[in-house]
From Swiss-Prot:
Keywords: Ribonucleoprotein, Ribosomal protein, RNA-binding, rRNA-binding. The gene is rpl18a. One of its GO terms (biological process) is translation. The keyword GTP-binding does not apply. This is Large ribosomal subunit protein eL20. InterPro entries: Ribosomal_eL20, Ribosomal_eL20_dom. The keyword Ribonucleoprotein applies. It comes from the Archaea. Part of the 50S ribosomal subunit. Binds 23S rRNA. One of its GO terms (molecular function) is structural constituent of ribosome. Belongs to the eukaryotic ribosomal protein eL20 family. GO terms for cellular component: ribonucleoprotein complex; ribosome. It comes from Archaeoglobus fulgidus (strain ATCC 49558 / DSM 4304 / JCM 9628 / NBRC 100126 / VC-16).
Amino acid sequence: MKFEVRGAFKTLEGWQKFTKVVEANNERYALEKVYSLIGSNHKVKRNLIKIEEVKQA
């Protein structure tokens, strides 16, 4: 299933909003995937990533 995850992560300039569509078996795995992607691409720790909404795409 595909999930659309919306949220924001902290940068030096402030909070940067994002929307990611990920393939996952359930909502929990979708969240883990987004934390992993944002963290690796932007060098942001999980406590600086705020998830606002997760819905099935």
